[in-house]
């Protein structure tokens, strides 16, 4: 008799995706982040569900309801901080996952890559709306500043912003709809994850060498299930350390002040994981130009397959490209730092130079370096 996991219609899908899936034998720990992102998503949905049971999306009671969760609900404080810091872990894993894709040329699988970029946008939208919900000072002013950027769109901008706000300013209608969308989007993300995996399993995983590994595959279980469990353990250890020892390390103290439309905080800034894009936005003196640069800073990932000029897929054997890749990482860290600084000298000029370098590296220097490496290999 055939094993039930190979014959049952539902178990067969799970078996082909998680148990008998052929995987390259050489994939390193950089391939762990897909499963870690899945765990992050599960943590966020579960903690978010329980938080939603106690949260009220009304401007008069939202801030109090979050305080009530932390003080009066059994283990409410741990739910709240798991959710807040879980978002940070989510983005750390996301950035490392995308970075791995760039380094090892995973973007050659266009369908998987494009769904991944859509996922990145969806997660960023979800995180932004979630940051508005506690209705602190930074929530309110962050929502005001970021939604107001849409007014830079010619002709329809102002109408679009008022339509999103549900009025003439960020108010009760805005908070209610942001809560509704913040609850809905993770389930859309879950569906997109399925599509992402569907496309990935059409081609199979890439590997560090970038060379097809069809002749050297091993079953996903037990080798990579054990490996993923180790990665999950490490991530949960970091997350719990953050939650239990310094839960507010990555947050903004201003968000412990209830939202006040009459009092603007001295430095309006988003959560740390948006700072690099915020720095690019601020470095351009023109509003529409800034908004375009902000969107393009992430949308640029879509054109990565077109910018691939190397004859090798991975950067593993391309030392010049490796140098530029790590320069890009350093540049993104610089932008993240600048995004959290006030708009004054010398931070303005550093931000502008870092923004120019970011686009220059991706659009010009990396493709040219790949062509140079192709010629060097001929010798």
UniProtKB/Swiss-Prot annotation:
Binding site for heme b b566: 97, 196
Cofactor binding note of this UniProt entry: Binds 2 heme b groups non-covalently.
GO annotation, biological process: mitochondrial electron transport, ubiquinol to cytochrome c
Other comment: Heme 1 (or BL or b562) is low-potential and absorbs at about 562 nm, and heme 2 (or BH or b566) is high-potential and absorbs at about 566 nm.
Keyword Metal-binding: yes
One GO MF term attached to the UniProt entry: ubiquinol-cytochrome-c reductase activity
Record's keyword terms, sorted: Electron transport, Heme, Iron, Membrane, Metal-binding, Mitochondrion, Mitochondrion inner membrane, Respiratory chain, Transmembrane, Transmembrane helix, Transport, Ubiquinone
InterPro entries the UniProt entry points to: Cyt_b/b6_C (IPR005798), Cyt_b/b6_C_sf (IPR036150), Cyt_b/b6_N (IPR005797), Cytb/b6-like_sf (IPR027387), Cytochrome_b (IPR030689), Cytochrome_b_C_euk/bac (IPR048260), Cytochrome_b_N_euk/bac (IPR048259), Di-haem_cyt_TM (IPR016174)
Location(s) in or outside the cell: Mitochondrion inner membrane
Keyword Transport annotated: yes
Residues noted as binding a ubiquinone in the record, renumbered to the chain: 201
Family annotation (PANTHER family): CYTOCHROME B
Protein name listed in UniProt: Cytochrome b
Record text on subunit structure and interactions: The cytochrome bc1 complex contains 11 subunits: 3 respiratory subunits (MT-CYB, CYC1 and UQCRFS1), 2 core proteins (UQCRC1 and UQCRC2) and 6 low-molecular weight proteins (UQCRH/QCR6, UQCRB/QCR7, UQCRQ/QCR8, UQCR10/QCR9, UQCR11/QCR10 and a cleavage product of UQCRFS1). This cytochrome bc1 complex then forms a dimer.
Binding positions for heme b b562 per the UniProt entry: 83, 182
Stated family: Belongs to the cytochrome b family.
Broad class of where this protein is predominantly found: mitochondrion
Gene Ontology CC annotations of this record: mitochondrial inner membrane; respiratory chain complex III
Domain of life: Eukaryota
Membrane topology: Multi-pass membrane protein
Bilayer-spanning residue ranges: 33-53, 77-98, 113-133, 178-198, 226-246, 288-308, 320-340, 347-367
Role summary: Component of the ubiquinol-cytochrome c reductase complex (complex III or cytochrome b-c1 complex) that is part of the mitochondrial respiratory chain. The b-c1 complex mediates electron transfer from ubiquinol to cytochrome c. Contributes to the generation of a proton gradient across the mitochondrial membrane that is then used for ATP synthesis.
Cofactor(s) for this UniProt protein: heme b
Species, as recorded: Pteropus scapulatus (Little red flying fox)
